[in-house]
């Protein structure tokens, strides 16, 4: 077990610690993406309808969003290492439960439990990176983390398709078992403990319940809207969400260490970074959901061509994210974020202005701009969110980072559904235009951070 370090772990312990983070976050992100590809197969095998099989995906996402902040708070209480190891155990066992499921109900329950395990991993992974890396190299750690998330998100469908071509859908989950065991052994050997703190915060159960209801109802309503559910049901969910949310926020304002980190949101640099994150992930999801419809329906490209034309975006993000991690050590995150998001907006506007029959190269280079711009923004923004919070509140900052990402992505997907319902085939153009405008707004908000002092790890 590594000793507590004042400024990061020494080598080679640092390599072992970051490896367990890489494996854990890869599994959590991949399992959010691979199930989509397998839904038709799962529905057929378990004798379920396509509509009901969507809950295999929804259950995982909802479980994550309702528990992220609670697990991050528990990380501040009991240590990020302990929560991470518990998350690995839950994720490993629930993956086995998923593979052994013989009904849709059983699989959905297993996915809920797996979502809680994934939330435990996501809630403290960036807080752990803050403990693993020395202050001067923290940007590189954030760059590696952003790189892994980008690779996992992009590779998820491909990995799922490869596994399904040679094995049953159960192996999508069984593959997590050996990986989880390796990650757990590495975590027990290399992950550092939290530093000592003067007092331990108290976990407030009513806050956790209200947090789950508020964010769970919001994500359920957004997902339901995107899937064309009853507007009456969606409106009822939103009304209950608002009522519970008001009581939730009022309670947080009265607590010395709140579950929803309103204390951190009072820090201008932190709140501006969270706002930038929500807007940028909303813009990203608006584009990524609408682009396949645009390429196939409007431009007449095949499914294979669509996949190839979309590939430059995640590839550019993967290349740029580690580079941005190095740049944050020298350039203000607000400037890097603004520049990256303006580049992303330029790529999106270029896609909006494409002619009726564009050459492939004229689709590819805007995709590269979008991916490179997003990669230039993401690592510095994550770095700022974590380092603008006090060290003892790193868990709260890490949980808020993940929550902002999920809220942005869910909102973006719902907006695409709205645009397609309102504007038909033109909805893809409107969605891309909305994404570009949101990217500009996010760039402007990021630019406001330049007036704030640079965060210190």
Swiss-Prot record:
GO molecular function: transmembrane transporter activity
Keywords annotated in UniProt: Cell inner membrane, Cell membrane, Membrane, Transmembrane, Transmembrane helix, Transport
Signal peptide location: none
Example GO BP: transmembrane transport
PANTHER family linked: MAJOR FACILITATOR SUPERFAMILY MULTIDRUG TRANSPORTER MFSC (PTHR42718:SF9)
Topological type in the membrane: Multi-pass membrane protein
Species whose genome carries this gene: Escherichia coli (strain K12)
Record's subcellular location: Cell inner membrane
Gene3D superfamilies tied to this protein: MFS general substrate transporter like domains (1.20.1250.20), Multidrug resistance protein D (1.20.1720.10)
Gene behind the chain: yebQ
Protein name: Uncharacterized transporter YebQ
InterPro entries: MFS (IPR011701), MFS_dom (IPR020846), MFS_trans_sf (IPR036259)
GO cellular component, one term: plasma membrane
Main location group: membrane
Disulfide topology: none
Entry similarity comment: Belongs to the major facilitator superfamily. TCR/Tet family.
Transmembrane spans: 15-35, 54-74, 87-107, 112-132, 144-164, 166-186, 205-225, 229-249, 269-289, 308-328, 334-354, 357-377, 400-420, 428-448
């Amino acid at each position: 077990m590594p000793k507590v370090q004042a400024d990061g772990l020494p080598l080679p312990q640092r390599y072992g610690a970051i490896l367990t983070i890489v494996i854990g976050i890869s599994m959590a992100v991949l399992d959010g993406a691979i199930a989509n590809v397998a839904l038709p197969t799962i529905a057929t095998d378990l004798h379920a309808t396509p509509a009901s099989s969507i809950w295999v995906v929804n259950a995982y996402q909802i479980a994550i969003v309702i528990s992220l902040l609670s697990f991050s708070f528990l990380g501040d209480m009991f240590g990020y290492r302990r929560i991470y190891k518990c998350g690995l155990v839950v994720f490993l066992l629930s993956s086995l439960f998923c593979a052994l499921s013989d009904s849709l109900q059983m699989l959905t329950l297993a996915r809920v439990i797996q979502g809680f395990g994934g939330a435990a991993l996501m809630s403290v992974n960036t807080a752990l990176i803050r403990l693993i890396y020395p202050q001067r190299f923290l940007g590189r750690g954030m760059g590696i983390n952003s790189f892994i998330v980008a690779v996992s998100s992009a590779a998820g469908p491909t990995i799922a398709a490869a596994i399904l071509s040679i094995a049953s859908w159960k192996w999508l989950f069984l593959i997590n078992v050996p990986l989880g065991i390796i990650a757990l052994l590495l975590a027990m050997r290399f992950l550092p403990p939290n530093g000592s703190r003067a007092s331990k915060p108290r976990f407030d159960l009513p806050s956790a319940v209200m947090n789950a209801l508020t964010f769970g109802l919001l994500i359920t309503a957004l997902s339901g809207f995107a899937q064309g559910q009853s507007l009456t049901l969606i409106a009822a969910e939103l009304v209950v969400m608002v009522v519970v949310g008001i009581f939730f926020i009022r309670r947080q304002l009265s607590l010395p260490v709140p579950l929803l980190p309103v204390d951190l949101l009072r820090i201008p640099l932190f709140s501006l970074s969270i706002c930038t994150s929500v807007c940028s992930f909303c813009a990203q999801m608006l584009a990524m959901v609408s682009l396949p419809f645009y390429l196939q329906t409007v431009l007449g490209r095949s499914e294979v061509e669509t996949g190839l034309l979309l590939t430059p975006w995640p590839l550019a993000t993967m290349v740029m994210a580690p580079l941005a991690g190095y740049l944050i050590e020298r350039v203000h995150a607000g400037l890097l974020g603004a520049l990256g998001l303006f580049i992303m907006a330029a790529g999106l506007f270029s896609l909006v202005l494409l002619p009726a029959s564009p050459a492939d190269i004229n689709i590819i280079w805007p995709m590269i701009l979008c991916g490179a711009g997003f990669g230039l923004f993401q690592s510095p923004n994550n770095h700022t969110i974590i380092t603008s919070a006090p060290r003892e509140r790193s868990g709260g900052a890490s949980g808020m980072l993940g929550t902002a990402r999920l809220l942005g992505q869910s909102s973006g997907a719902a907006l695409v559904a709205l645009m397609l319902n309102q504007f038909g085939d033109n909805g893809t153009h409107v969605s891309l235009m909305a994404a570009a405008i949101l990217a500009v707004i996010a760039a402007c908000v990021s630019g406001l951070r330049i007036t704030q002092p640079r965060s210190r790890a």
